Amino acid sequence: MSSSWDIRVTDTSLRDGSHHKRHQFTGDEVRAIVGALDSAGVPVIEVTHGDGLGGSSFNYGFSKVPEQELISIAVDTARNAKIAFLMLPGLGIKDDIIVAQDNGASICRIATHCTEADVSIQHFGLARDRGLETVGFLMMAHSIPPEKLARQARIMADAGCQCVYVVDSAGALVLEQVSDRVEALVQELGADAQVGFHGHENLGLGVANSIAAVRAGAKQIDGSTRRFGAGAGNAPVEAFVGVCDKIGVKTGIDFFAIADAAEDVVRPAMPAECLLDRQALMMGYAGVYSSFLKHAERQAERYGVSSAELLVRAGKRKLVGGQEDQLIDIALELQREHL
């Protein structure tokens, strides 16, 4: 890792932000955002469909521009930043990894539910064999205790993962809950792999939780410029960088340049601000996967029910990523109850 930072920041505006934009990024938008983030010193930029490689589908939403084309544009634009991609085993396939690398991406981020790390083993093996840097995502990390999360992290590390992330997919973790999980992974993995943290703003704690993760030993942190992500968005990179500057943590990112990028380049590409509104708040409170927001709003409108109530019910059922279709069942259930 370069000495220009104490921690490495990955900007996920062009992947997590795809949920908020309903996967409608254009090539020009990717070119502009990558150029601005790269100029500001962001070391890693993630680019894919919101649900990762292969996510463009009837169930998750179709991409306006094929994700592999967007990856190629990002690689051609970036002068210093590395381009990363996300994939969920079973949604994306191993051939997608090969194509993304052929298009110039150099960091493979593989995500599983926090109890299913074993499904990533062959994908990490392929990525390492091909010389890609590897990152693992343990999603919905709030839903199991730290010691169980650490055991899942060990599975990823043994498979070849070089950094395992505590992923607060629902934005449900609160401060010490982040620290406890990061510390558990640091203790389990030691020098075998780094630990990272990916947060959401659904309880307004994205930056605070990210700082808690850094203090607990995390070496890689995700964020999205202008909070451009699912739910209420991710930890805003510009705010996180500002806080890091104040507490003496080096990110290698220029605060003023990233603030300009957020205002002048990223915001114009957003369909609307990512808000901590009632629906997003309910996701954080009930522990609902952040990408469910737009799906819930669509089904609530279709069936004439409350999207907030729909999300709370989804939280009680402990739905996970990939179960978005069950929102229809819940909406019908609520509709019958309100007749």
From Swiss-Prot:
Gene3D superfamilies: 1.10.8.60, Aldolase class I. Its EC number is 4.1.3.39. It is an enzyme of class 4 (lyase). Mn(2+) binds at D16, H198, H200. The keyword Lyase applies. It catalyses: (S)-4-hydroxy-2-oxopentanoate = acetaldehyde + pyruvate. CDD domains: DRE_TIM_HOA. Substrate binds at R15, D16, S169, H198, Y289. One of its GO terms (molecular function) is 2-isopropylmalate synthase activity. Keywords: Aromatic hydrocarbons catabolism, Lyase, Manganese, Metal-binding. The active site is at H19 (proton acceptor). InterPro entries: 2-IPM_HCS-like, 4OH_2_O-val_aldolase, Aldolase_TIM, DmpG_comm, DRE_TIM_HOA, PYR_CT. GO terms for biological process: catabolic process; L-leucine biosynthetic process. PANTHER family: 2-ISOPROPYLMALATE SYNTHASE 1, CHLOROPLASTIC-RELATED (PTHR10277:SF9), HOMOCITRATE SYNTHASE-RELATED (PTHR10277). Belongs to the 4-hydroxy-2-oxovalerate aldolase family. This is 4-hydroxy-2-oxovalerate aldolase 3.
